[in-house]
């Protein structure tokens, strides 16, 4: 069964590269191979209710983008990635809880596993009576673990700045 997922926006950003946190030492490496490459970020409404829905949505979105010749979406080359935002609520009538974001998930299988992992993590925190802290997370597929890469206190911490060198796309 198809489910309609509404989009909030689509915008072009410039890839800034990535940080690689080495586990065997205290070093963080910077990979600038994709730095400066344009990327299309598509932001959807918070209407996806499960990890399997997220996987289905992304599979469809990738197929659509490829069929329209917008991008190759080669996941092995980092050309199609997902940032998953997760927030829980007790029932449909309540507003969404505090959001966490898992960055740069690079396969549909990992999207499903990472989201399920974070849902379980948040459930455990809430069942203890503690509060979810807004943060950015990284998923490690080999160990099926998540770690916090930075805390975010408010919307300003996301640091969105328009780039004067990029013209608006209408």
In which residue ranges do the predicted regions lie?
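Basic, nucleic-acid-interacting segments
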Residues: 1-170
């Amino acid at each position: 069964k198809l489910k309609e997922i509404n989009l909030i926006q689509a915008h072009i950003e410039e890839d800034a590269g990535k940080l690689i946190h080495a586990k065997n030492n205290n070093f963080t490496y910077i990979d600038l191979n994709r730095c400066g490459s344009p990327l299309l970020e598509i932001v959807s409404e918070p209407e996806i209710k499960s990890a399997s829905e997220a996987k289905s949505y992304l599979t469809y979105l990738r197929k659509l983008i490829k069929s329209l010749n917008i991008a190759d979406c080669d996941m092995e080359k980092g050309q199609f990635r997902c940032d998953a935002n997760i927030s829980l609520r007790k029932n449909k009538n309540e507003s969404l809880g505090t959001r966490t974001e898992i960055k740069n998930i690079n396969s549909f299988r990992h999207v499903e596993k990472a989201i399920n992992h974070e849902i379980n993590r948040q459930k455990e925190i809430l069942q203890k009576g503690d509060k979810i802290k807004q943060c950015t997370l990284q998923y490690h597929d080999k160990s099926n673990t998540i770690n916090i890469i930075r805390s975010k206190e408010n919307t300003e911490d996301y640091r969105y700045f328009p780039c004067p060198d990029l013209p608006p796309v209408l």
